[in-house]
Structures are given as structure tokens and as C-alpha cells.
Curated annotation (Swiss-Prot):
GO terms of biological process kind: selenocysteine biosynthetic process; seryl-tRNA aminoacylation
Enzyme class: ligase
Localization (cell): Cytoplasm
Name assigned to this protein: Serine--tRNA ligase
Organism: Yersinia enterocolitica serotype O:8 / biotype 1B (strain NCTC 13174 / 8081)
Catalytic activity: tRNA(Ser) + L-serine + ATP = L-seryl-tRNA(Ser) + AMP + diphosphate + H(+); tRNA(Sec) + L-serine + ATP = L-seryl-tRNA(Sec) + AMP + diphosphate + H(+)
Keyword Oxidoreductase included in the entry's annotation: no
Signal peptide annotation: none
Family, as annotated: Belongs to the class-II aminoacyl-tRNA synthetase family. Type-1 seryl-tRNA synthetase subfamily.
InterPro entries the UniProt entry points to: aa-tRNA-synt_IIb, aa-tRNA-synth_II, aa-tRNA-synth_II/BPL/LPL, Ser-tRNA-ligase_type_1, Ser-tRNA-synth_1_N, SerRS_1_N_sf, SerRS_core, tRNA-bd_arm
Length: 430
């Protein structure tokens, strides 16, 4: 959520920045709403003051033994007008808030202007794609040969875009998540957290999934039903519950940064993805991910983005998987992001790089929604924190990359060296 003061006082500048990411801000409507809000605010305050003044006269008149009925009627009439003005002001403020919640974050000035993924900027590459002297198989074929990926069973149990993993493939999937968690907690300084997979609407508003992206979630009740304590949604990413741990909190600045990680399943309806990546593990309704979250002082967040992205890169480097680092353009960034790097891993069967991690600085966009603040030790003043998040990594897509990059001519999969301690010393599976 953007700063309301910016929307009031720097509207043209805000509109220009939003236009860079392809969002057209209705400047005229916002101006009209703000003018109407000011009028109603003045009217409400004036009626309140007048009613208070006339109420005091009733007591004085009563003490003098005068007839107070005319004054009482006048006060009642003022009260009715005040209630009506307050109701209109509340309605308008809710409309203004609803509009504000639908406006995306402002892109940082360092973000390249562009329309879509074709305008993203390649920052760097790591590793060289392996050359094969045999016909490369994709991860689906490799997994089925090993008896470890069963999509037919998942269709029977649930439907499309789910999978049943078995045997050494399931073990490797678990090993990858464990390896990532150990790396982030033991080497990168993150606190491991275990969080609910179902969250309430306030949590989803806090990180920006609601109200705009309700259709992308799996809900326990229809979204249009009034939210209550039992109206939950499955998390689309651990970013949602982990970041919301600081909602409505005031943190001491010396305690920052907070660095937290969690391994969770993630659930997405993939609305709008019909026909895309229908084969295999790339685009699933349920998938595992190890998420990293940082809560920082405002002045530290850009350096934290570089650090957090480096932590995701380290996973790929230790697994010896070739990848490239992309700086997303304004038109390809997520709704709440101010700046985002994507890491794309090399998939031999597709002969291309595919996203495996997205690392973003959300600036104070989520913090304002969550009212997450930090307090200075010296002057005791509070200000909004900055929030960052990144995949470290998507476990299923990492499994895809390992299967394809480590495949052998006979269909076996070499186990990456860093995973062998998690797999009982196995060197090959399949």
C-alpha cells in the first residue's frame, strides 16, 4: 500500500512512476475523492463542535430554570446531521482505502522500464550448461523411469497439476529441502520457522494477496462470503505467514535485520495459466518451497536484497546448476515489489533457462498494510520497516533441474555431492 500522503500531495509523480509498470492511475477520481473527503471532514468537525456547544447551553439553561426543549430538539437535529455526515465520510474513506489497496508498488529508479519478460535485463550467468553425447530426456521421463514420479496416481487422487513422488525421487525432494534449510540457518543466519499453511484474510491483506489476487488462492469458504475467524485460504507462499509475524509489531531497530526461513507446501490455483507447462513439475497447484524473509531498516533494504539474492544463488552454486540472474523490468514485476531479481536455472530438455527463484524488495508497501514498524533507540520515534522475500529455492523446480542436469546415458541420476549426506551416501538413483 502506498503512502496516502504521496497520493494526496505527489499524485502526478506517483502516476508517472506507476505508468512505467503499465498501471494507469485514475488521477482525476483520486483528486475528486480527496476534495470530497476534505469537505466532509470539515463538515463533520463543524457539526461536532456545534453540537457540543449547544449541549453545554442545555445545562446552563436548565440551571436557570428555562425551557430546554427547543435546545434539546436542536441538539438532536445536529446529532442526526452529524451521524449522516460521519456515515458518508466513513463510506468515502472505505472507497479511498479500497482503491489504495488496488494500486501496485512504485518501481525503484534502478529498475529498467519495460513491458514484459522480454525487456528483463540479464545481470550475470554462473556455470556452463553441460554438453551431452546422448539424447537428453526430460524430468518426467527420468522420474517415471526411476518409478518416482506418478502423475496418473495424482490425477486419480485429486486432478491435474498434482504429483505423487515415491522412493528415491521422494527422498531427493526431501533432501533438497533439508539441504536448503541447513544452508540458510547454519551459514546465512536465518531463523527457521514452522508456520500455518492456512491463514486468515487479514494476513493475506498484509502481504498484498487480497483484495486483488483472491482468485489465485484456494479458500475454505467462497471469497465473497463475509470474512470471519473461520474463513481461511491456503498459503501461496511462506512469504505470507512469515512476513506477517511482524504485523502490528514495533521492533527495536537494533534487533534488525530479522532473517527468517520456512519450508512449506504452497498452493496456487494457477488461474490464467491454462495450457502452460501442462507436462511435469514446473507449474503445480501444490509444490514445496523454502522461503527467505528479511525485515530491515529502510536504509538497509537495497543491500539486503543483494544479500538475500546471493543466498538463493548459493544454493544453485553448491548444487552446481548453471543459472542466470535477471533484473525484472517494470512491466514484469510482482504487484508489491519495488525491485526484483529472478534466478533462472538451465533445463537441458527445454534448452532454456527457467525461473527457480524470485527475490524482491517490497520497500514499505507490505509494512504499511501490516503496520509493522521499528523504533529508534535514541529518539524513540517509529517508522515503517522494509520487507524482503525470496525463494531459496522452489524445491520441485530444483528437483527438475537436478534430474535433467545430472542425468546419465542409461537414465540414472547422479546425486549432487552436497546432497549425498542427506541420501545415505547414494551416488546414483534410478
Amino acid at each position: 500500500m502506498l503512502d496516502p500522503n504521496m497520493l494526496r500531495n505527489e499524485l502526478d509523480a506517483v502516476a508517472e512512476k506507476l505508468a512505467r509498470r503499465g498501471f494507469k492511475l485514475d488521477v482525476e477520481m483520486l483528486r475528486q475523492q480527496e476534495e470530497r473527503r476534505k469537505v466532509l471532514q470539515v463538515e463533520t468537525e463543524s457539526l461536532q463542535a456545534e453540537r457540543n456547544s449547544r449541549s453545554k447551553l442545555i445545562g446552563a439553561a436548565k440551571a436557570r430554570g428555562e425551557d430546554i426543549e427547543p435546545l434539546r430538539l436542536e441538539v438532536n437535529e445536529l446529532g442526526e446531521k452529524l451521524d449522516a455526515a460521519k456515515a458518508e465520510l466513513d463510506k468515502l474513506q472505505n472507497e479511498i482505502r479500497d482503491l489504495a489497496l488496488s494500486i501496485p508498488n512504485l518501481p525503484d529508479d534502478s529498475v529498467p522500464v519495460g513491458k514484459d519478460e522480454n525487456d528483463n535485463l540479464e545481470v550475470s550467468r554462473w556455470g556452463e550448461p553441460r554438453q551431452y553425447d546422448f539424447e537428453v530426456r526430460d524430468h518426467v521421463s527420468l522420474g517415471e523411469m526411476a518409478g518416482g514420479l506418478d502423475f496418473a496416481a495424482a490425477v486419480k487422487l485429486t486432478g491435474a497439476r498434482f504429483v505423487v513422488m515415491k522412493g528415491q525421487i521422494a527422498r531427493m525432494h526431501r533432501a533438497l529441502a533439508q539441504f536448503m534449510l541447513d544452508l540458510h540457518t547454519e551459514k546465512h543466519g536465518y531463523l527457521e520457522t514452522y508456520v500455518p499453511y492456512l491463514v486468515n484474510h487479514a494476513t493475506l491483506y498484509g502481504t498484498g494477496q487480497l483484495p486483488k489476487f483472491g482468485g489465485d488462492l484456494f479458500h475454505t469458504k467462497p471469497l465473497e462470503e463475509e470474512s470471519d475467524s473461520s474463513n481461511y485460504a491456503l498459503i501461496p507462499t511462506a512469504e505470507v505467514p512469515v512476513t506477517n509475524l511482524v504485523r502490528d509489531e514495533i521492533l527495536e531497530e537494533e534487533s534488525l535485520p530479522l532473517k527468517m526461513t520456512a519450508h512449506t507446501p504452497c498452493f496456487r490455483s494457477e488461474a490464467g495459466s491454462y495450457g502452460r507447462d501442462t507436462r511435469g513439475l514446473i507449474r503445480m497447484h501444490q509444490f514445496d518451497k523454502v522461503e527467505m524473509v528479511q525485515i530491515t531498516r529502510p536504509e538497509d533494504s537495497m543491500a539486503a536484497l543483494e544479500e538475500l539474492t546471493g543466498h538463493a544463488e548459493k544454493v544453485l552454486q553448491l548444487l552446481e546448476l548453471p543459472y542466470r540472474k535477471m533484473l525484472l523490468c517494470t512491466g514484469d514485476m510482482g504487484f508489491g515489489s519495488s525491485k526484483t531479481y529472478d534466478l533462472e536455472v538451465w533445463l537441458p530438455a527445454q534448452n532454456t533457462y527457467r525461473e527457480i527463484s524470485s527475490c524482491s524488495n517490497m520497500w514499505d508497501f507490505q509494512a504499511r498494510r501490516m503496520q509493522a514498524r521499528c523504533r529508534n533507540k535514541t529518539d524513540r520515534k517509529t517508522r515503517l520497516v522494509h520487507t524482503l522475500n525470496g525463494s531459496g529455492l522452489a524445491v520441485g523446480r530444483t528437483l527438475v533441474a537436478v534430474l535433467e542436469n545430472y542425468q546419465q546415458a542409461d537414465g540414472r541420476i547422479q546425486v549432487p555431492e552436497v546432497l549425498r549426506p542427506y541420501m545415505g551416501g547414494l551416488e546414483f538413483i534410478g
